[in-house]
C-alpha cells in the first residue's frame, strides 16, 4: 500500500513539472515573457495608473492582477527578493535598486 501511494505521488509530481515546463515553453514560443516565478511580464501597460515613472517601463500580470509602479517594488521585495526578508531588511527599496531590477528582467 505505501509503495502504491509513493508511485502515485511521483506520477503526480512528474505531471506537474512537465505541465509547468510545457507552459513556460509555450509562453516563450508565443513571445510572452515569464520570469519563472509565475509572473508574466506585460510591456507598456499600466501607464496611467503608475505613480513611479522610473519604474513604469512595464508591469507584471500575476495571478490575474496587474502590478505596476510602486507595486513592482512590493513584488520585488516579497517574491523576487526573498533574501531581503530573511535578512529582515526594510520592505521598501529605493528607485535605483528598482530600476536595476527591471533592467535585469529584460
Curated annotation (Swiss-Prot):
It holds the Pfam family Insulin. The keyword Translocase does not apply. Transmembrane segments: none annotated. Disulfide bonds join 45-50, 46-80, 59-68. It is found in: Secreted. Its main location: secreted. Residues 1-22 form the signal peptide. Keywords: Carbohydrate metabolism, Disulfide bond, Glucose metabolism, Hormone, Secreted, Signal. Residues 23-37, 86-106 form a propeptide. Insulin decreases blood glucose concentration. May have evolved to activate insulin receptors (INSR) in vertebrates. Molecular docking studies reveals unique interaction with the human insulin receptor. In vivo, insulin-like peptide injection reduces blood glucose levels in two models of zebrafish diabetes (streptozotocin- and glucose-induced). Also shorter swimming distance of zebrafish larvae, an effect which is not observed with human insulin. This is Insulin-like peptide 04. It comes from Exaiptasia diaphana.
